[in-house]
């Protein structure tokens, strides 16, 4: 089973790089078993939240972790005998069967990706982080969306919004009718019942908060403060609010109620007309200002374009005013400029010659320096090439040793095919033995039937002859004794076969129990029981220490 254990170790190392490989599964500790099984279950079912490590100390926590992993394996479809003892007291046979099942249940996409990648290369921290991010995003995409106001505190923390930011801005023009219906007329009551918006509608149409608006209205009613007309106009222009409802006494008439409302309506209409007039005038002035600005821009561009030509014409007119004198001045200026140019050319040649010589020297020095640098680089590259060649030879030697010590994948595949061929051959041999056994059983049945018929026929003949002949009577007794002895022999042979079969079954069970390391498991169970007893004694001492002060008081 060494090759099977190596294959299992290789697959587990691909699942979780933190699992330290061992030579055989019998050397697996409970902590390694828990980490390997939890890693495989996490790959099979990413939604499962299983512990990755086995806690130390408290046995109750260890039993809980082992039981949860056993339940996860059962949910994944494992039909074998599994429980907390499989993880706390592992044996090689059951552990091998469990890990082979989990490796077969791994996703095919992951296995194909691993086959294409290098098996000896472990995942980097960046790849592990990307895998974790993909799992988190997949888990968040599977969760249903819940609005923020319907989330509990725990759910908010899970979904990344531990608090809600609400702007408590009041609606200062909130309209709340009085609680006494006798103070309102029939028309006002009808308006409030059918047309007036309620508190929720007044605050829902804007960014104002309901609680803040009600508190603000209560403060206004408490201190009997009224808003000015300018404030009301500002609020009306910012966000529309329902018209205020004036409360009147029951003894007022309908004409007195309508007069202030009509006056306010007329004032509002006049202000609206004035506002529209001012807006129209403002638009007309804005159009005129835009046209003037455009004309100003065009004029500035035209002036900028004409200004150089104007300066040129001014200079030309100044020169043409006294042409002979200006021509003489220009000739003198031209001669002085030529002599100055010749002088400057000579000075430049005197200054340029040493500079050219120094430039040639610098170029030569730079080329020599570059050649020296190239030679140094060549020497350095040769040294690196020698080092790389030596390292390549060392790695080749290591690869040869590794290939000699560890069988490659093809060798594993070849051995697996050999195992399968041997199993098929054994199965064919078993079928052949079963066929031979059936044929032999048929022959035995035929021979037994023939013997039974011959015995019955002989028994009848001897029985008829025994009535008249003494020798026939003695032969009949010997025949009966022979038949009884033959039956005893057949029973003895059957009992011998059953005993041999039971002996073989017991030998197989003994071999299986030897592989389970019963003695080691019993020692671990004894140690765990002692830890439980020690923990119980500590709890009893704590209870006594708590009860003694209470008894003294």
Swiss-Prot record:
Keywords: Coiled coil. Residues 261-286, 314-407, 498-549 form a coiled coil. Pfam families: CCDC22_CC (PF05667), CCDC22_N (PF21674). GO terms for biological process: positive regulation of ubiquitin-dependent protein catabolic process. Residues 236-264 are annotated as: Disordered. It comes from the Eukaryota. GO terms for molecular function: cullin family protein binding. Belongs to the CCDC22 family. This is Coiled-coil domain-containing protein 22 homolog. It comes from Drosophila erecta.
């Amino acid at each position: 089973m060494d090759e099977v254990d190596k294959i299992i170790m290789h697959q587990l190392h691909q699942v979780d790089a933190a699992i330290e490989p061992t030579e055989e599964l019998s050397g697996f500790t409970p902590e390694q078993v828990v980490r390997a099984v939890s890693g495989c279950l996490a790959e099979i079912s990413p939604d499962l939240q299983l512990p990755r490590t086995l806690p130390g100390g408290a046995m109750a926590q260890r039993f809980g972790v082992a039981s949860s992993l056993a339940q996860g394996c059962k949910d994944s479809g494992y039909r074998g005998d599994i429980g907390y003892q499989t993880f706390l007291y592992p044996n090689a046979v059951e552990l091998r069967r469990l890990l082979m099942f989990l490796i077969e249940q791994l996703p095919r996409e992951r296995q194909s990706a691993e086959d294409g990648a290098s098996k000896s290369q472990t995942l980097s921290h960046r790849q592990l982080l990307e895998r974790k991010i993909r799992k988190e995003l997949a888990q968040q995409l599977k969760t249903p969306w819940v609005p923020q106001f319907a989330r509990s505190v725990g759910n908010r923390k899970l979904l990344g919004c531990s608090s809600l930011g609400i702007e408590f801005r009041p609606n200062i023009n909130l309209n709340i009718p009085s609680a006494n219906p006798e103070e309102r007329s029939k028309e006002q009551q009808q308006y409030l019942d059918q047309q007036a918006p309620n508190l929720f509608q007044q605050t829902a149409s804007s960014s104002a908060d309901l609680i803040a608006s009600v508190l603000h209205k209560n403060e206004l009613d408490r201190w009997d403060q009224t808003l000015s007309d300018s404030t009301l106009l500002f609020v009306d222009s910012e966000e529309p609010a329902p018209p205020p409802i004036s409360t009147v006494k029951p003894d007022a008439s309908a004409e007195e109620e309508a007069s202030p409302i009509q006056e306010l309506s007329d004032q509002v209409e006049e202000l609206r007309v004035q506002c529209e007039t001012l807006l129209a005038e403002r638009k007309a002035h804005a159009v005129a200002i835009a046209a003037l600005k455009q004309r100003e821009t065009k004029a500035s561009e035209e002036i900028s374009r004409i200004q150089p030509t104007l300066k040129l014409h001014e200079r030309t007119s100044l020169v043409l005013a006294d042409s002979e004198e200006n021509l003489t001045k220009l000739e003198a200026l031209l001669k002085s400029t030529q002599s100055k140019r010749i002088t400057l050319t000579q000075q430049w040649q005197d200054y340029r010659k040493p500079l050219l010589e120094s430039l040639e020297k610098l170029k030569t020095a730079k080329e020599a320096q570059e050649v020296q640098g190239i030679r140094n680089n060549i020497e350095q590259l040769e040294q690196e090439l020698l080092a790389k060649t030596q390292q390549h030879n060392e790695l080749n030697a290591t690869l040869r040793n590794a290939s000699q010590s560890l069988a490659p994948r093809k060798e594993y595949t070849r051995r697996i095919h050999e195992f399968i061929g041997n199993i098929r051959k054994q199965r064919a041999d078993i079928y052949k033995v079963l066929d031979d056994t059936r044929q032999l059983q048929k022959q035995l049945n035929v021979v037994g039937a023939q013997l039974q018929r011959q015995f019955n026929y002989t028994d009848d003949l001897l029985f008829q002859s025994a009535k008249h002949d003494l020798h026939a009577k003695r032969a009949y007794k010997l025949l009966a004794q022979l038949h009884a002895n033959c039956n005893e022999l057949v029973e003895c042979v059957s009992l011998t076969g059953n005993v041999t079969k039971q002996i073989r079954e017991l030998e197989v069970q003994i071999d299986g129990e030897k592989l389970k390391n019963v003695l080691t498991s019993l020692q671990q169970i004894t140690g765990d029981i002692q830890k439980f007893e020690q923990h119980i004694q500590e709890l009893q001492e704590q209870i006594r220490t708590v009860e003694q002060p209470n008894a003294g008081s």
